[in-house]
Every structure is written in C-alpha cells, then in structure tokens.
Amino acid sequence: MSASRFIKCVTVGDGAVGKTCLLISYTSNTFPTDYVPTVFDNFSANVIVDGNTINLGLWDTAGQEDYNRLRPLSYRGADVFLLAFSLVSKASYENVSKKWVPELRHYAPGVPIILVGTKLDLRDDKQFFAEHPGAVPISTAQGEELKKLIGAPAYIECSAKTQQNVKAVFDAAIKVVLQPPKNKKKKKRKSQKGCSIL
C-alpha cells in the first residue's frame, strides 16, 4: 500500500437539508432523530480506495445566513465540495445555482463539486407531503439537469436515515479528487496554436 493522501471534503448547502445527518450517518452508521444544527466536529477517517489509503477530512458548515461571513473560512484547502439540497425542498434546490455555486466559485475556484440530493426516503412519503402541503419533490431528472447546469462531475441522491447511497456520495468525492475529469487536454491543444508577427 502507498502512503496515505489527505483529502479535505467540505459539505455546503441550505440549513436543514441534512448535511450534518449525512456526515453522522457516514461516520457512525447512525441517524440522529432530532434536528441538530451543525454540531458535527471536523472528522478524519482512513479509507482504502483501490489499495490506496486515503485520509478523508470531513468538514461541516452551517447553511444559515448568520454564518455567511464565517463559512468561507472552511473552504481554504478544500479538495472537493459536497453541495447538498433536500429532495423535498424546492428552495434548497434553487439555491444551489443562485447562492451556493457562486459562493464556491468565488472563494474556491476550480474545486470540484459533487451535487447531493438528500432525504431520498421522503420523496415518495405521502405522509410527509400531507403534513407539509407546500413541499415540492425534486425528481432525479431535475437533479441531473442541475448537475449539468453547474458543471458537477457527479449527482447522487441519498438518504442518511436509511443509509441508501450514503457511501456512494463519499466514494464519488474521493474518486473525483484522485481521478479528475480529463478535459484539460483540449484546452492545452488550443493554446498551442502560435501567433506569427510578420
């Protein structure tokens, strides 16, 4: 096995979309039953990927506007962002492109973003929608469309409660850092065209 590599993974997104629950579900295989606003301590875990040891540093951020000035301090040195929205909150879905992507591109240009749809277990929950008449479910197609719009390399829907696809979210984050998309070659070819002054 090779020496371990550190990857800093930062979660961002609106308040109450399930960022902290996603991290707790991944790191402890449990789901907190009460809403706990961002109390997840920064966490570090060794993960084996393709025979390589990865030291995965997980950073949680608060989505509420009160933290707009402090939150970007967490972005320094980030290797990848998990940008989360709730699959039962149209506002959080819309804020991905309105608020979060501009903020991330400003403070951390070039850092890849994995788009994450949370609360998958609630999307088909009739009781949830009966109790929340204003809630609008976000379809997989809408998530894929948003992924293309923001240029994210991956879009994953998950449920921290049932743990469905939770590991896949973090696997995708690690993979995009270890094997970045190969679109830089095209740019190099364009820049190789010379300029002649006669």
Curated annotation (Swiss-Prot):
Q: Which Pfam families match?
A: Ras (PF00071)
What keywords are annotated for this sequence in UniProt? Auxin signaling pathway, Cell membrane, Cytoplasm, GTP-binding, Lipoprotein, Membrane, Methylation, Nucleotide-binding, Palmitate, Prenylation
Task: Name the NCBIfam families on file.
Answer: small_GTP
Q: What is its main location?
A: cytoplasm
Q: Which GO terms describe its cellular component?
A: cytoplasm; nucleolus; nucleus; plasma membrane; site of polarized growth; spindle
Removed propeptide positions:
196-198
Q: What is this protein called?
A: Rac-like GTP-binding protein ARAC3
Q: Name one GO biological process term.
A: small GTPase-mediated signal transduction
Residue list for modification Cysteine methyl ester: 195
Which GO MF terms does the UniProt record name?
GDP binding; GTP binding; GTPase activity
What are the binding positions for GTP in this chain? 13-21, 31-38, 60-64, 118-121
Please state which protein family the record places this protein in: Belongs to the small GTPase superfamily. Rho family.
